[in-house]
């Protein structure tokens, strides 16, 4: 990926285009009425049609009906709580587990401030924020997948044979 040339703001042709408002939208096509009136309803109706089509073709239940007399072996939370559940499950000290849970939203709130002096929107030009995001995503996926496994295989995802028993 090459470095793009910055625009010369002293160029009279570019200044004339910017004065006409052609700097933001390169093609000069207005959002109203073309996008908002014609394209957006097509996308919305297409999404609704796909959802209805999938519901008609595969009318399955959301889950198994609840049986009040049978307790599952391991009670798992909803899928979006798997990483946090894995933190609580693997950390031996509950106070440390709660502090780690507080660090998750705190870390998410600090990501925009990592490179706030960098005004580029391209992720390739924001290497620190992009790296932190990718590492955070990998850790969240690792914790989420590990939460679905038994506790002895949860940290290694069952890929390595590790003996964690205390002797």
UniProtKB/Swiss-Prot annotation:
Main localization of the protein described in the UniProt heading: plastid
Presence of keyword Plastid: yes
Lipid bilayer topology: Multi-pass membrane protein
Keywords tagged on the record: Chloroplast, Electron transport, Membrane, Photosynthesis, Plastid, Thylakoid, Transmembrane, Transmembrane helix, Transport
Alphabetical list of SUPFAM superfamilies matching this protein: a domain/subunit of cytochrome bc1 complex (Ubiquinol-cytochrome c reductase) (SSF81648)
Record's keyword annotation contains tRNA-binding: no
GO biological process, one term: photosynthetic electron transport chain
Disulfide bridges in this chain: none
Protein origin, superkingdom: Eukaryota
Subcellular localization: Plastid, Chloroplast thylakoid membrane
NCBIfam families, sorted: cytb6_f_IV (TIGR01156)
Oligomer status and interactors: The 4 large subunits of the cytochrome b6-f complex are cytochrome b6, subunit IV (17 kDa polypeptide, petD), cytochrome f and the Rieske protein, while the 4 small subunits are petG, petL, petM and petN. The complex functions as a dimer.
UniProt record similarity statement: Belongs to the cytochrome b family. PetD subfamily.
Cited function: Component of the cytochrome b6-f complex, which mediates electron transfer between photosystem II (PSII) and photosystem I (PSI), cyclic electron flow around PSI, and state transitions.
Identification of the protein by name: Cytochrome b6-f complex subunit 4
